[in-house]
Amino acid sequence: MESRTGRNKQRYNSKGERLVAGVVPLTEDRLYVLLIQSTRRKGWVLPKGGWESDEECTEAAEREAWEEAGIIIRIDYDLGDVIDSRPPKRLSKDAPKALYRFYEATVLTEENNWPEKHKRERQWFTYSQAKEALSDRPELLQALELSTMHRS
């Protein structure tokens, strides 16, 4: 899979929101979710990124999972749109308001080398651990809650 950089092919909707594809990457048994470290600030996030004009949304989700987390996935469910609920002070030119489309996915392979390995760690979390780790990102928490992950 080819890694991409830049936003020259980035999609935006009629409201000016950046269209972002993301995944809730789970183990086959649905007991663990893989989170990655944010590059913008401290904390954990789900793999996600811009949906580009020359790809389908599912392709963007698969590409972002590879680039950011080094995983090969199988998309299982479309979790639908998730509204960006970040307050205006957390938005910027580099992080504009977004409309997220999340997919539940099964992780098939974790690669040892991937495009963003040098700037991100990845870690498996239980549902309760992930809820705590994503507590300051309501849009990511909503995606997790829409998934079929076991709530134990």
Question: What are the roles of these predicted feature ranges?
Answer:
Residues 28-74:
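Conserved Nudix-box catalytic region and its N-terminal flanking loop in Nudix hydrolases
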Residues 82-113, 123:
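Active-site-adjacent beta-strand/loop module that shapes the phosphate/pyrophosphate-binding cleft
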Residues 71-76, 142-144:
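Short arginine-rich
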Residues 42-43, 109-152:
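Nudix hydrolase/Nudix homology domain
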Residues 1-22, 28, 92:
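Acidic, metal-coordinating catalytic segment for phosphate/diphosphate chemistry
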Residues 14, 76-81:
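Sequence/structural signature of beta-propeller domains
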